[in-house]
Structures are given as structure tokens and as C-alpha cells.
Amino acid sequence: MDILRRTTSVELTRLPVSAADTLSDVVFPWQSLCFRLAMVFNNEGGKYDKDGRALMVAVGESNFVLMWRKLFNALCIAPVVVDGSDTQHKLNAESGSLHTSTSSSWCTYDPTRTGTLGKIAGKLFVVTAKCVCEGATLETTAPTSGEVEESGQGKETPIPRRIECVYDFHYTLPDFDIWGNDVTIGFLVMSHYSGNGNVDFVRSLDPTAARVKNLFKSPTVVLGTCHYRAVASRLLRCTSVARQISSTSVMICVNVANVAHVPVRVQEVSFDIYSTQMGEGDNDIGGVQLTHEQRFGPCGTDLKAIKLLQRTVTVTPLLLHGRCLEETLQPGESACFQFAIEVQPHLCHLLETHPRQEPHSRYANNTASVAVEAKNAPYSMRNDVSPILPHSPVAPQTVWRPSPIGTVECVPCSELKQVLFSKFVSQAYVSYNPIVSAGGESTDQRVASPLVSLSGTRCPGPCSRRGWPRSGKRRRGNTCSQLKLSPATCLHILRVCVCVCVCVFAFDGSKGAGQFYCVIGSLFFFRSFSLFLCPLLTVCLLRAKIFNI
């Protein structure tokens, strides 16, 4: 196996996906990258003749070209993402450059080290060389005439001076867990021929390859690992701004921008008040990549305050300009989503300003003074006091609201005001789905439907007749067809309707034979219906024969 790695050089090159691709060092999740992998055997001057014959003996082939086809006609590649900050895999080169190396931890099975070095970032896929001669791209330099004569006399087949196999493949990046740091994308290259049950072949090339069977479920010869370094960036950039509209309402604007190279379909934007943190909170927590089932939870010391907050405020999402989810954001586009946080109506008086509280306080003070005077007055004078007045000045000190089980739960006003006047940080979740086709290229699912007016004609819109694809398959959406009728065509249709009605009436069994001749005569009158004469005459004759007319 060391002979094969020593004699074969591997080169990984990134290719532009489109004409506008600038091959930037910054990559985004779900971005499609195109790579070219070249396996080259360079035997200039015959320096690897002995090694080549040793490989032929190990594989059991007498022809080096056939042996090369067995090994490199098809390769199995496993993508692996490694943190660029790992010192063991930190390569001594600039970011974004190409590297080729072999990691011993991926050639042998070591469960204590493999999990910490990298993780599989995609399914295993098979790439095939460009077919030129029986399924392989082989650029072989022909031997000289003297070498051919020597081989014809029974001597050994000469080793070619150069053989090259080229593989082109697309790879879609996964979601990264790190942002703004160097990320290393490794492609673990294995021989696909060895994975077809050729255990003897695997053992002949690499006696330690049985350890790899635990990882990939089949004996595999690991040829090496090609690395590509880049800088990971976010797919969506989310920012939020909170504005106080009044003393009892707050407006929150969440701006979502697509900073990637692929369209993104925003499926849902939700505001989770349960993930609220009292106080300033952690500002670094925003913009974290989570799966659809993960949510942030509150701090243990804030559970009581969050429970009061859930029962005292309401969160209402607002639609702008008739926007409805789902919405597709093209690269560089952004969308704004708003939420209104309002205090419950029966609790708004706790947050009202002082001018609005003065009439209520003046009324409460007057009522309390009248009650005190009525209590201190003689018995004869108490009959003049209204019975609805209280006997003692009792001011409400608690705010209550029925709980779901029907009991009354009292909360002190001071505690409720402390919660409403405090600062808190909550989370807004954006559910999205990158639009990436199976071939690696992004496909736009935004479909513009043509506009249809009341008159039945098509209004100028994005889906005009010139906009349909040439393949004949129309895009999704509602379409309308335009039917133009001339006066002659309308008269023609009217004649058909009249003739059909007359025929239906005439072919009633209770009518006489004279009606048949009337129908036939009316058809002769309309010169446009010569095609209907033969069928009608046949039916008339059959009907006359049946009824003996």
C-alpha cells in the first residue's frame, strides 16, 4: 500500500460552478461546489518500474494498464468536515489553497480519536473517470518501438511513463457549527473495486485494512485524503430592532437577509416568549444554527417571571403588504417580519401615565373622605349617606386573573409591575429550507402567475408567451388562454347548435317520417355541414326501416 501511495499523486482542484462563480474563499451552508480530482502515475525515466511490477504482482495482473483500471476506474469518496482550528490538521499554507495528505486516523479504526477529528458530512458517493477506453480516462504515453519488440520476444510488459484519471463531482456543503473560522473539507478517497467483496485483494494491498471495515461496513483500501480549506459563513443574517409604540405596546422588527449563493425558502418566523431571559441577556446567543426540534429554554431563576409575562402580554405577528409565508429569498434579498407585543387590556391601567391616573385617584380620595365622614357622623345622620359607599377606605392592592382550573390566583401589584417594567431578551425562530437540486445546482421555486383581467385577455406580466421554456413544459401557476371569435365563426357555431336541437327533436320515436325529411332539407340549406350528410342519411334510412316508414 505504501508503494501505491508513493507512486501515485493526487491533485484536487476547485472548478467554477457557473460563469459568474469567483471561487471565493468564503463558503456558505448548502452551497454547491465543483471539484476535479486527478490521479496521476508519473514514471518519467522509469524510476517506478520496480514499484509498478510489485503492484502488478499484488493485484495479480500482468498488464499495468489493466491493473490501473481496476484500481482507479471508480472511486468511493466520503466527505468529512474538520475544524480548521485543529492543530493536527492545520496545514502550513494559506487559507483556501489545495492540499493532499493522508490521515492515519482515517486509515485505521480508532474510536477514541476518530470522533474528535472530524465527522462525516454527507453520504458516500462513487465517481467514475471520464470514459475513453472501456470506462476510464487514460492518458498513456505509447512505448517506443524497441520496447514493443522486446515485449513481443517474451520479455516483461513495459510500465507506462504516465497514466492519469480525472474525476469531476459536485458537493453540497452541510450546515456548519462554526462561523467565521477556517473549516477544512476533507474527501476520503477509497478504491471502489476493493469494496465489491474482494477481501483477498484488500489484504494483499493493505494488511491493516480490516480495521476500516468497522467504519464503512466493507473492506476498503483507503488511498488518502484530499483537503480543501475555506472560511465558513452564515446562510441567513438575522437582525432585530425593538421600538416602543406606547406605554403598553412594543413593536419588534426581524430582518432576514439571504447572504448565500442559493435561494432560501422561509417557511415560518415565530416568536418564542418561553425562551425569554430577564435582564440584558446574552447578546452572543443570537443567530445560532439549530435543528427544527431544538429550542432555547429559560433560566431557572426566571421561571416565575416568565410565567407572569406569558399571562400578561400577547404576541401578534403582523403581515406587511399582503406578504404570506412561504416566501423565497433570492441571493442578496431580504424580508422584514414584525411582531406586536401588547399588555392585556385589563392590566393596561398599571402602565398608564400620571395624567390619566389623576381622575381615578381624585375619585378614590373623594370616596374615601366621604366614607370616613359617614363613619364618624351621628346615627341620625348616617341615613343620609348612600349605602353603596364603603365603610372603610380599601384600595385594591392585588391584580387577579382566573387560572385554567377555575381558582383565583392573586399576584401583588408590585411584583407584576416589576416584571412589566424590566428588560428581557427573547428569541425569534426562522424556519427555512435551502433550494438545492439533486444535481447540486440551485433551482428557483418562485413561480410568477400571469395576471388575468375581467375581459379575458392577458395583462402584461412576468409570464408572457415569450417567457415559456422552449422544452414545452410550462411553469407552475395559473394560466389563461385567449379565444378570438370572428362573426363568421359565431354564426357557424349557432348553426351547429340549431341543427343539433332539430335533430334531437326529430329523432323522437313519436314523430312522423316527414320530420326526417325536414331535418335533411335543413341540413342541405347549410352548406357548411356537408360532412354530416352521410351519417344522418344512414341513420334516417335505418330508422325508416325499423319503423316501416
Curated annotation (Swiss-Prot):
Domain of life according to the entry: Eukaryota
Other remarks on record?
X92 crossreacts with PFR-antiserum (PFR = major structural protein of paraflagellar rod).
Q: What is this protein called?
A: Protein X92
Q: What is the organism of origin for this protein?
A: Trypanosoma brucei brucei
